[in-house]
Amino acid sequence: MDIDVVVLQSLDKFIEFSEPDEFSIIRDFGQPQRYFNSSVMKWNNDFATEMIWEEYQKNLEHYKTLQGDQNVITDAMNLHGKKILKPYPDEWTFSYKWTHRKKPKFGEASRTYEVVDDASIAVFHGKPNPHESTQDWVKDNWK
């Protein structure tokens, strides 16, 4: 889990969600059908290392052309990991900036900075960061 997330509820369901031989990750907020967001992930090194790290090392020049770890992970999962991929339910996380995952990217997402009911994690991708927020719910939960 990234350090720039705000935990609002217990994380137990994230731990219990997938089996040891599955890779769990949240879907991207801007292009959820195409990419993953690496802010919240869970995997077992016994099998995921080969699919991500060893794949990255083997095809380093290709992966250097991609922007950021999220794109590397998405590419590696699309290449090797579909059978073990189990994305977390969208309603468990939300973007601080965009209330709903929308397609196309930067659709008519509102910027109300409100908590999404029943979500456990608010993801701060890009700017602002949690310590820059003026919302009380962020200040109360960012520790």
Report each predicted region and the residues it spans.
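Residues that flank catalytic or metal-binding motifs in active/ligand-binding sites
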Residues: M1, F36-S39, D69, D117-D118
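GT-A fold catalytic core of metal-dependent nucleotide-sugar glycosyltransferases
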Residues: M1-Y35, K42-W43
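Short, glycine/charged-enriched secondary-structure capping and boundary segments
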Residues: F14-E16, S38-V40, Y56, D136-V138
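Residue-level preference for the first positions of well-ordered beta-strands
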Residues: F23, V40, A119-I121
